[in-house]
Amino acid sequence: MANNLIVMTWNVENLFPPEDTDTAAADTYTAKLTYLAGLIVGTGADVVALQEIGSLRAAQDLQAALGEPWQAVVSSHPDSRGIRVAVLARHPLTEEAQILALPPSGLPAVPDVDGDTLTHMGRGALQVHVDCGGVGLRLLTAHLKSKLLTYPGGRRYPLNEDERARGAGYALLRRTAEAVALRVHLNKALAAAAVNGQPGMPTILCGDLNDGPDAITTVLLEGPADGDVNRPDKGDAVRLYNLGRRLPPARAYSRIYQGNGELIDHILATRDLQLQLITIDSLVDDITSIGASTRSRKQTVVPDHAPVIARFNGQRNQPV
């Protein structure tokens, strides 16, 4: 691993290339690419996990704005709106897995609002290997089901309060099934790489998990609980730590919704990386409060989420 490794996760809010005839949208898109690239370069980030990339072209445009030697890997599994996850890095990148199916060993029998059984995540997750020195870094990024509710037939409004309650329950069930699918995938990957009961490959899971650090859908991604990170135990090989718990209290949020800060963008890491963490921050200075309506956001350059960024001391490559 490099002497210092800087990892960022950022929901860049509907980064879609404009239609050829929409000059206003083209100007906004160009300004947004300039803003995104400037902030990424300014932080010195080595690896950036992105959510709400609107197309392969959007990822390529951001890669071009960053310039050499940046590389990109993009998920092949967007949601119905076309948004997907991607990873950009200024080190060699290798795609390792596109994660989509809800596995039999997870929660394979979860219903959706129309009474069908879910078989896959709404937006595919992505696993890459970053060749950043030493054994490198395994990174997974995901964008779990949002709190936005939908109802039978695609309606955005309930017919009654019972249906509203069911809609909220279905959204939570989907997010839970997606989180379990990620954890099942991680269980296998982490266990296979373990060395002497410790992580054999530094691993990060990051992205927009659409709930807070204490929500069960976030906590279950950590794996077995840990009483003391400084004392090795049998759970170390598969455990992740939510680094957001070490954010400065005044900046422990990544989005402002109706005036309230909430931390829904997370970086989880294996024990070796937790012990090598130097700083973590949420770059909240530019974001503003948003509401339920998205119409006013169409011409906005600054995304509604703040990037969360972690800096690691990479000089120690072996687990403690």
Task: Describe each PLM feature range.
Residues F16-P18, L56-A58, G82, K147-T150, ...:
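Short catalytic/ligand-binding loop motif for oxyanion handling, primarily in non-cytosolic enzymes
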Residues W10, Q51, A142, G207-D208:
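Active-site flanking residues adjacent to catalytic metal/cofactor-binding acidic residues
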Residues P18-A31, K147-L173:
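A solvent-exposed, charged loop/short amphipathic helix patch at secondary-structure junctions
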Residues M1-V7, M121-E163, N317-Q318:
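Beta-strand-turn-beta hairpins that frame and shape the catalytic cleft
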Residues V47, E52, H77-P78, R84-V85, ...:
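A shared catalytic/ligand-binding motif for oxyanion handling
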